Design a protein with these regions (language model features):
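A short, well-structured juxtamembrane/interface segment
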Residues: 21-39
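Hydrophobic beta-strand scaffold residues
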Residues: 43-44, 139
Length: 194
């Protein structure tokens, strides 16, 4: 296959996956985030690898891109950014517990957890989701492929239904920017930010 054809095929698959997203699912997730904002709840977010980068990016864009200039602020806490804590739990306990044990330090009933997993089967994400489900919280899963277990156990989910990890991750990054614009518009009347 020529490189040009490979590029065209990627763009076609990405565009189709975007068009196939369930808008109602996205709207529900943005409503959950607005409710958390209105009720001053924490919003935790986690993922591994590329999904960890997406989690950090989401926290930045909402904490700064949406909250800037508002009297009341979003409380987005990425569970992916404290390398010392992550490595301590990985080394001393088990990698499966890196998000669960962090969330226990800050969690209050009614808080929200967004778990991102391309496969939908990342055990450390699932353990944190299960904890929040069992403790009167709200869970959102962002998945790829068929959604895996994360799609099943999350109260709300957005699934990039494609058997391609990179396109799944592209969709999740698009969700970050889409959510930022939706939330910013809802709270300020404008999508613009500094």
């Amino acid at each position: 296959m020529k490189v040009e054809n490979q590029i065209e095929n990627y763009i076609v698959k990405l565009t189709k996956t975007l068009k196939d997203l369930n808008v109602k699912d996205i709207e529900q997730c943005s409503s959950v985030l607005l409710d958390a904002y209105e009720n001053k709840k924490n919003i935790f977010i986690c993922g591994n690898g590329g999904s960890a980068s997406t989690a950090s990016h989401f926290a930045c864009d909402i904490n700064k891109g949406v909250s800037y200039g508002l009297d009341k602020r979003f409380k987005i806490i990425p569970l992916t950014d404290n390398l010392a804590t992550i490595s301590a739990y990985s080394n001393d306990v088990n990698y499966d517990f890196i998000f669960l044990e962090q969330i226990k330090n800050f969690y209050n009933p009614g808080d929200v957890l967004i778990g991102i997993s391309g496969s939908g089967n990342s055990m450390n994400v699932l353990k944190a989701i299960e904890f929040v489900n069992e403790n009167e919280g709200v869970t959102i899963g962002w998945t790829g492929f068929k959604g895996g277990k994360l799609k099943e156990v999350s109260q709300f989910s957005i699934n990039a239904n494609i058997d391609d990890m990179q396109i799944s991750e592209d969709i999740h990054m698009t969700l970050v920017h889409l959510m930022m614009k939706v939330l910013r518009k809802k709270l300020t009347g404008s999508e613009d930010y500094i």
